[in-house]
């Protein structure tokens, strides 16, 4: 069976699944099975903290049920309209919801855009000038990018009376592949990202088309779809993927490649321990200096006082299972559950 036949059979099966969907979120998740979307790309490229190419493959090959992210979908969809409205007020642009778009020549590459950006209303003859991706984030944590620390959501755009005067593309790196994918599919030259952080702060960014990255995305996406999805061949697994596999006990004899990797890992672990020891010494010295304070500030280059660090007690509510077992032993037994844990890698 050639790839075209496999695609047609696949599409027919997805259509049968759609007929069984009971709500909007299930329908949305099932429609995503028709191809690769922007939110899949970071994982396929190996640049996602949360998912791997193997995770995406399991979903696209029907090994994992769709509709497991309903709460995230419902919450994100509800806030999307709020973020989009504030974007309009800040920028002066007009945004409209958009239908999905299949890339010319690659119908399995599908852009499900949050919004398309117009220079004015459609009634006034407005034209599409860009796209908009709406995001929400609980907090703006620190990350390492190219060896340097920065906020996950960096300095954002600056607007003066709805005019963009300073551009920034310092978005969460997880989403760079997504917006580049959308520009590749649509042919648009820029995509704005609007994010609501902690339900209290809105930031806006502009990302321009990167042809080199888009070519990498295209190559990876086509290969993943044809070689892995349609031919039903799993992509290379990460260690996290391998841990989740349930395998019967069996033994392999180490070859040169395995021995080389194990020895390389040992060398890295030694270096890691040395760094951790050095880090502990620095933290102990720092603790001695700030032990009597809960917050430390500094003055930046602009003369503004900023928070450098906080050192506060955190409250955590947890379930006391031991006390519950002592007071309600029979009820405790009723709720015991035995599960198989992920595989644990140990070295000897």
Task: List each model region and its residues.
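Short, charged, low-complexity amphipathic alpha-helix
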Residues: 173-176, 205-273, 326, 348
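Extended, charge-rich alpha-helical segments
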Residues: 121, 132, 270-348
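Nuclease catalytic cores
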Residues: 72-80, 84
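Short, hydrophobic/amphipathic alpha-helical patches that form generic packing surfaces
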Residues: 36-42, 55-59, 180, 184, ...
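A short, surface-exposed helix-loop junction/capping segment
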Residues: 57-72, 244-249, 261
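Nucleic-acid nuclease catalytic cores
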Residues: 73-74, 89-113, 117-225, 229
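N-terminal, Lys/Arg- and Ser/Thr-rich interaction peptides
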Residues: 7-67
């Amino acid at each position: 069976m050639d790839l075209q036949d496999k695609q047609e059979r696949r599409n027919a099966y997805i259509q049968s699944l759609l007929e069984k969907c009971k709500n909007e979120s299930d329908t949305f998740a099932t429609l995503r099975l028709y191809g690769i979307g922007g939110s899949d790309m970071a994982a396929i490229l190996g640049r996602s903290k949360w998912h791997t190419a193997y995770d995406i493959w399991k979903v696209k090959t029907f090994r994992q049920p769709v509709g497991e992210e309903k709460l995230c979908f419902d919450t994100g969809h509800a806030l999307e309209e709020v973020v989009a409205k504030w974007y309009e007020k800040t920028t002066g642009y007009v945004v409209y919801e958009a239908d999905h778009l299949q890339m010319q020549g690659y119908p399995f590459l599908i852009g499900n855009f949050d919004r398309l950006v117009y220079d004015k209303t459609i009634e006034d003859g407005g034209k599409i000038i860009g796209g908009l991706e709406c995001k929400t984030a609980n907090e703006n944590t620190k990350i390492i990018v190219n060896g340097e620390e920065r906020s996950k959501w960096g300095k954002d755009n600056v607007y003066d009376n709805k005019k963009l005067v300073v551009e920034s593309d310092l978005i969460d790196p997880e989403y760079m592949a997504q917006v580049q994918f959308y520009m590749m599919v649509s042919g648009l030259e820029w995509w704005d990202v609007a994010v609501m952080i902690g339900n209290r702060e809105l930031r806006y960014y502009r990302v321009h088309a990167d042809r080199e990255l888009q070519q990498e995305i295209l190559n990876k996406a086509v290969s993943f779809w044809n070689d892995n999805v349609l031919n039903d061949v799993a992509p290379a697994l990460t260690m996290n993927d391998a841990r989740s596999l349930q395998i019967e006990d069996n033994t392999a004899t180490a070859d040169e490649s395995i021995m080389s990797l194990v020895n390389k890992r040992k060398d890295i672990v030694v270096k890691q321990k040395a760094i951790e020891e050095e880090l502990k010494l620095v933290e102990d010295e720092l603790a001695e200096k700030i032990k009597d304070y809960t917050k430390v500030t500094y003055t930046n280059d602009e003369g503004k006082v900023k928070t450098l660090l906080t050192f506060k007690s955190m409250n955590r509510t947890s379930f006391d299972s031991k006390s519950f077992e002592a007071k309600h032993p029979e009820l405790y037994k009723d709720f015991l559950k035995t599960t198989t844990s992920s595989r644990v890698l140990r070295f000897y």
